Amino acid sequence: MNIVALHVVLYQPEIPANTGNIARTCAATNTTLHLIRPLGFSTDDKMLKRAGLDYWEFVNVVYHDSLEELFEAYKKGKFFFITKFGQQPHTSFDYTDLDEDYFFVFGRETSGLPKDLIQNNMDRCLRLPMTEHVRSLNLSNTAAILVYEALRQQNYRDLK
C-alpha cells in the first residue's frame, strides 16, 4: 500500500503571508508545495518567513518556471484546478486512490488561473461553495480546506 501524495501548487503567488500559511499547512500534513515562478515576493521576505514560522525545514518546496514544466515533470499526476468558475464542488471528487499523486492548483490572488487552462480542463475544475456576495475566499484558507478534504477521505493517513 502506497502513501497517497498530496501537492499544493501556487501559480505565481503574490502575497507572501498566504504562501507562508500554506507552507505551514503543508508541513503539518506532509504535502509538497510547488511554487510556479515568477513569485510576487522574495523567498527571503519577512512576512513569508513569519507566516511559515519555524516549520520551513519540514516543507518540501519545489520551484517551477512554468505550469508546463510542472505538468511535464509529473505526467502521471492527477491535477485539479481551483477556480470560482468550477462547475463541481471540491467534495464531488474522489482523492482516495493510493496509486495517485493529487495536485491542487491555485491561481494568483488577484487574477486566478490562466483562462485557457480553465477552459481546457473544466472537468477537473472545482470550486468551494459560498454565498453570491463574496467574490473569493482567502487563498491559504482554501488550500487548507482542499488538503484536509483529501486527508479526510483518506482517514487522515499518517496524521495524529
Curated annotation (Swiss-Prot):
Subcellular location: Cytoplasm
Catalytic activity: cytidine(34) in tRNA + S-adenosyl-L-methionine = 2'-O-methylcytidine(34) in tRNA + S-adenosyl-L-homocysteine + H(+); 5-carboxymethylaminomethyluridine(34) in tRNA(Leu) + S-adenosyl-L-methionine = 5-carboxymethylaminomethyl-2'-O-methyluridine(34) in tRNA(Leu) + S-adenosyl-L-homocysteine + H(+)
GO molecular function, a single term: tRNA (cytidine(34)-2'-O)-methyltransferase activity
Primary subcellular site in the record, as a coarse category: cytoplasm
Keywords: Cytoplasm, Methyltransferase, S-adenosyl-L-methionine, Transferase, tRNA processing
UniProt xrefs under CDD domains: SpoU-like_TrmL
Record-level GO BP terms: wobble position ribose methylation
EC number of the protein: 2.1.1.207
Binding-site residues for S-adenosyl-L-methionine, renumbered to this chain: I82, G107, L128, S136
GO cellular component: cytoplasm
TM spans (from-to): none
Any one Pfam family match given in the protein's UniProt record, by short name: SpoU_methylase
EC top class named in words: transferase
Coiled coil: none
Function statement: Could methylate the ribose at the nucleotide 34 wobble position in tRNA.
Recorded family membership: Belongs to the class IV-like SAM-binding methyltransferase superfamily. RNA methyltransferase TrmH family. TrmL subfamily.
HAMAP family from the UniProt entry: tRNA_methyltr_TrmL (MF_01885)
Protein name: Putative tRNA (cytidine(34)-2'-O)-methyltransferase
Species the sequence originates in: Bacillus subtilis (strain 168)
